[in-house]
């Protein structure tokens, strides 16, 4: 795909200055080191350095033109003869729109659904992809674990890819015949305009609880970032195009603002509260391997069976099914497919049932990505429903991240677990012991607790202490296969460590 520079600039409502060359653009690049002849260089402002500072290097290496910020132009001023465009602020917004236009606005060719919230994004997006594919609609998935579409799969580097490569991926997905797309949209992505140029057919708000306050400063700022998905990126046609969890106070606030532009959903047991929602569940029965009940929607009521564990996963299911019904897919077909959903790696993943032959008397071991106070509480409550004896929890908190949530996670663990093993979880530049001390400040009730900074030993300790009918929840890393220590990233997988610890276990009583 190729376009001319002037055409691209006019498409995003920018004036073309006198004397600016009008080269044909072969591709877009944000890395001056990877420029190929005919590329348009987009100098993005990063966390540590402004990529626009390297515009001259990009031109030397064959870029036909460069687009940079005013700040970058002051450091290395271009002449009027240089093929350089200086963008107004916010630069990231214009670059996202430019990338979308270059790739032919691919999001407008599919039913793209954005999922945002603190917890539940990954499971909800996996559900949407699975259900649409099961109904015969080729689908794409963009998120924390993976980016994939027919005949293509790649490990994700970010929950939401940056705008320029994201638009290229969307075009490839469209070329592969995709009809639906499920995209996790993080608050960072919304703040940094990574989804600029994306037209969302639908959106889901899962919940909002404490996380990323090292970046957003306050819950209000965090909420405003999330809410921008619904205010600025949804297609406008006057009808409902979103599903909002009103059991969450921030969701209730957003739903009130959106009014008839959304469907609300609730799991509240109070029937008067629940039945005010557009989507809700009745006749709920807990089974050993999931739930069954009746799912109520504005388009009808159907029986369902869900293989997902935990009440929070009922909300994920309700929202995934709800947004697809809202977009026109048949409720009965969606629920028929739901029972076959294989789950999500590292999300309430039962290790004993994951290719590991269980001996009589083994404890049940669960690995989950829960890394916020609310997420940990949900995972512990779900795990409690599976235990006939003790609930053991292994967890830590990330270094160089929101310190305020550490004591809150300690408080949650002490409240809901019988035995806690506090350990490391990507300590980065911080001392693991200092992080553990911060966690300990929240453990004020009389709790059985062990401290083991070495995560592999902590997992072994928890499983070694577990008896028959105990449940061990290993929280925080989920699907991740690494541990970040100082400037080093080492291979580490909670699931592998759990299987190893189970294989060494000899005491089953």
UniProtKB/Swiss-Prot annotation:
Annotated positions binding ATP: 117-123
Top-rank EC class of the record's enzyme: ligase
The keyword Cell division appears for this protein: yes
This enzyme's EC code(s): 6.3.2.13
Needed co-factor(s): Mg(2+)
Pathway terms, separated by semicolons: Cell wall biogenesis; peptidoglycan biosynthesis
Superkingdom as given in the UniProt entry: Bacteria
Catalytically driven reaction(s): UDP-N-acetyl-alpha-D-muramoyl-L-alanyl-D-glutamate + meso-2,6-diaminopimelate + ATP = UDP-N-acetyl-alpha-D-muramoyl-L-alanyl-gamma-D-glutamyl-meso-2,6-diaminopimelate + ADP + phosphate + H(+)
Gene Ontology biological process terms in this record: cell division; cell wall organization; peptidoglycan biosynthetic process; regulation of cell shape
Cellular location(s): Cytoplasm
Alphabetized InterPro entries for the sequence: Mur-like_cat_sf, Mur_ligase_C, Mur_ligase_C_dom_sf, Mur_ligase_cen, Mur_ligase_N, MurE/MurF_N, UDP-N-AcMur-Glu-dNH2Pim_ligase
Gene Ontology molecular function: ATP binding; magnesium ion binding; UDP-N-acetylmuramoylalanyl-D-glutamate-2,6-diaminopimelate ligase activity
The entry's keywords: ATP-binding, Cell cycle, Cell division, Cell shape, Cell wall biogenesis/degradation, Cytoplasm, Ligase, Magnesium, Nucleotide-binding, Peptidoglycan synthesis
Binding site residues for UDP-N-acetyl-alpha-D-muramoyl-L-alanyl-D-glutamate: 32, 159-160, 186, 192, 194
Keyword DNA-binding among UniProt keywords: no
Modified residues (N6-carboxylysine): 226
Motif Meso-diaminopimelate recognition motif location, chain numbering: 425-428
Binding-site positions, meso-2,6-diaminopimelate: 401, 425-428, 476, 480
Post-translational modification: Carboxylation is probably crucial for Mg(2+) binding and, consequently, for the gamma-phosphate positioning of ATP.
Function recorded in the entry: Catalyzes the addition of meso-diaminopimelic acid to the nucleotide precursor UDP-N-acetylmuramoyl-L-alanyl-D-glutamate (UMAG) in the biosynthesis of bacterial cell-wall peptidoglycan.
Similarity field: Belongs to the MurCDEF family. MurE subfamily.
PANTHER family to which the protein is assigned, alphabetical: MUR LIGASE FAMILY MEMBER, UDP-N-ACETYLMURAMOYL-L-ALANYL-D-GLUTAMATE--2,6-DIAMINOPIMELATE LIGASE MURE HOMOLOG, CHLOROPLASTIC
Name assigned to this protein: UDP-N-acetylmuramoyl-L-alanyl-D-glutamate--2,6-diaminopimelate ligase
Organism in which the protein naturally occurs: Prochlorococcus marinus (strain NATL2A)
Gene field: murE
């Amino acid at each position: 795909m190729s376009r001319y520079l002037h055409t691209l600039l006019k498409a995003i409502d920018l004036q073309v200055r006198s004397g600016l060359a009008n080269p044909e653009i072969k591709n877009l690049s944000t890395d001056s080191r990877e420029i190929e002849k005919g590329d348009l260089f987009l100098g993005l402002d990063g966390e540590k350095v402004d990529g626009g500072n390297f515009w001259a290097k990009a031109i030397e290496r064959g870029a036909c033109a460069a687009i940079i910020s005013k700040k970058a132009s002051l450091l290395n001023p271009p002449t009027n003869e240089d093929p350089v465009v200086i963008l107004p602020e916010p630069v990231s917004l214009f670059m996202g729109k430019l990338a979308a236009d270059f790739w032919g606005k691919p999001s407008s060719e599919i039913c793209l659904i954005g999922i945002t919230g603190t917890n539940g994004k990954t499971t909800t997006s996996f559900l949407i992809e699975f259900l649409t594919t099961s109904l015969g609609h080729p689908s794409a998935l963009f998120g924390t674990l993976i980016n994939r579409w027919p005949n293509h799969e790649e490990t994700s580097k970010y929950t939401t890819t940056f705008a320029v490569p994201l638009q290229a991926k969307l075009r490839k997905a469209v070329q592969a015949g995709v009809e639906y797309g499920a995209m996790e949209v993080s608050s960072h992505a919304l703040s940094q305009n990574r989804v600029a140029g994306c037209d969302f057919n639908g959106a889901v708000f899962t919940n909002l609880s404490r996380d990323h306050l090292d970046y957003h400063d306050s819950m209000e700022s965090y909420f405003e970032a999330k809410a921008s998905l619904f205010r600025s990126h949804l297609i406008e046609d006057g009808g409902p195009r979103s599903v909002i969890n009103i059991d969450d106070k921030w969701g209730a606030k957003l739903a009130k603002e959106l009014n008839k532009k959304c469907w609300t959903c609730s799991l509240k047991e109070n029937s008067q509260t629940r039945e005010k929602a557009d989507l809700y569940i009745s006749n709920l029965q807990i089974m050993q391997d999931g739930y069954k009940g009746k799912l109520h929607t504005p388009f009808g009521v159907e029986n369902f069976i869900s293989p997902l564990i935990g009440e929070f996963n009922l909300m994920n299911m309700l929202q995934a099914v709800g947004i697809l019904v809202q977009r026109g897919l048949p409720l009965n077909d969606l629920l028929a497919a739901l029972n076959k959903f294989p789950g999500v790696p590292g999300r309430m993943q039962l290790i004993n049932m994951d290719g590991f032959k269980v001996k009589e008397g083994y404890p049940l071991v669960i690995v989950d990505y829960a890394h916020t106070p609310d997420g940990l509480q949900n995972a512990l409550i779900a795990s409690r429903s599976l235990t006939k004896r003790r609930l053991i929890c292994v967890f830590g908190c990330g270094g160089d991240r929101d310190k305020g949530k550490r004591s809150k996670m300690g408080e949650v663990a002490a409240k809901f677990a019988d035995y806690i093993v506090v350990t490391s979880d990507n300590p980065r530049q911080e001392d693991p012991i200092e992080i553990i001390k911060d966690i300990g400040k929240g453990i004020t009730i009389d709790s059985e607790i062990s401290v083991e900074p070495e995560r592999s030993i902590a997992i072994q300790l928890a499983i070694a202490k577990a008896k028959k009918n105990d449940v061990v929840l290993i929280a925080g890393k989920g699907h991740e296969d690494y541990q970040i220590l100082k400037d080093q990233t080492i291979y580490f997988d909670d699931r592998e460590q759990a299987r190893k610890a189970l294989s060494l276990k000899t005491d089953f009583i």
